[in-house]
């Protein structure tokens, strides 16, 4: 099972542009459910509770991600994937850590692709991080080399298909 597990509901799909849930934010940010709920309590994250679940518009999520109290925490979580990979001297199996910087791309489309594929593909030994750095999307993948390379290859195949249309 991957670290950031998300089951996308049909009526509140991450890719529909309507709402994000807390579980979506944990996947995107790497922050824990509890940390995100603390940001809600502090008023840093705004949302609406519907049927017992917090819902956030894309605008609310973007404002949250850009908040000066939140962004450093997210960056620390993302960078921890790389630091942990380098610091771990005894690995139980082969592992790979890849940082993919994609300048001048549709950042939302990149995030959606990786979130969707990780949650709907056969990826069980992979850790994922995404950040938008200026005009660049940054994807960090860590885990089983076969899974990491498969996911990267799928992204480039999809990217080539979309660019040729």
Task: Please tell me what each predicted stretch does.
Residues 61-90:
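A short, Lys/Arg-enriched interface patch at domain edges and termini
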Residues 2-5:
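N-terminal export/ancillary region detector
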Residues 17-19, 53, 134-138:
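A generic structural signal for beta-strand entry/edge sites
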Residues 29-53:
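Major-groove DNA-recognition helix of helix-turn-helix-type DNA-binding domains
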Residues 48-68:
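Short helix-start
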Residues 9-31:
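Polyanion-binding surface elements
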Residues 88-165:
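Mid-protein regulatory/catalytic core that forms ligand/cofactor-binding pockets
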């Amino acid at each position: 099972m991957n670290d950031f597990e998300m089951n996308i509901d049909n009526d509140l799909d991450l890719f529909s542009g309507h709402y994000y849930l807390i579980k979506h934010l944990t996947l995107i940010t790497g922050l824990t459910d509890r940390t995100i709920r603390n940001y809600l309590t502090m008023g840093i994250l705004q949302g609406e509770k519907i049927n017992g679940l917090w819902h956030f518009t894309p605008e609310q999520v973007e404002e949250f991600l850009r908040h000066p109290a939140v962004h450093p925490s997210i960056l620390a979580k993302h960078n921890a994937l790389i630091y942990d990979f380098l610091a771990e001297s005894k690995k139980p199996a082969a592992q790979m850590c890849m940082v993919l910087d994609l300048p001048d791309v549709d950042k939302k489309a990149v995030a959606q692709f990786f979130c969707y594929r990780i949650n709907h593909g056969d990826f069980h030994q992979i850790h994922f991080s995404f950040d938008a750095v200026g005009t660049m999307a940054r994807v960090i993948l860590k885990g089983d080399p076969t899974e990491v390379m498969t996911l990267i290859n799928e992204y480039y195949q999809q990217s080539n298909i979309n660019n040729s249309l």
